[in-house]
């Protein structure tokens, strides 16, 4: 379903967003 797909994308993109945020802080 759409929620399963959204969840997969969220899991994929979340680490990237966190990494970008951490890089900007430094």
Swiss-Prot record:
Record's keyword terms, sorted = Antibiotic, Antimicrobial, Cytolysis, Fungicide, Hemolysis, Membrane, Secreted, Target cell membrane, Target membrane, Toxin
Pfam families to which the protein is assigned, alphabetical: Antimicrobial_4
Question: Any one Gene Ontology biological process term?
Answer: defense response to fungus
- List cellular component terms (GO): extracellular region; membrane; other organism cell membrane
The task this protein performs is described as:
Has a broad spectrum of activity against both Gram-positive and Gram-negative bacteria and S.cerevisiae. Has insecticidal and hemolytic activities. May act by disrupting the integrity of the bacterial cell membrane.
Q: State the organism of origin.
A: Neoponera goeldii (Ponerine ant)
Tell me which InterPro entries the record gives.
Antimicrobial_4
The answer to whether keyword Cell wall biogenesis/degradation applies is no
Protein name, as recorded: M-poneritoxin-Ng1d
């Amino acid at each position: 379903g759409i929620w399963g797909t959204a969840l997969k994308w969220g899991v994929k993109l979340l680490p990237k967003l966190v990494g970008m945020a951490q890089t900007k802080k430094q």
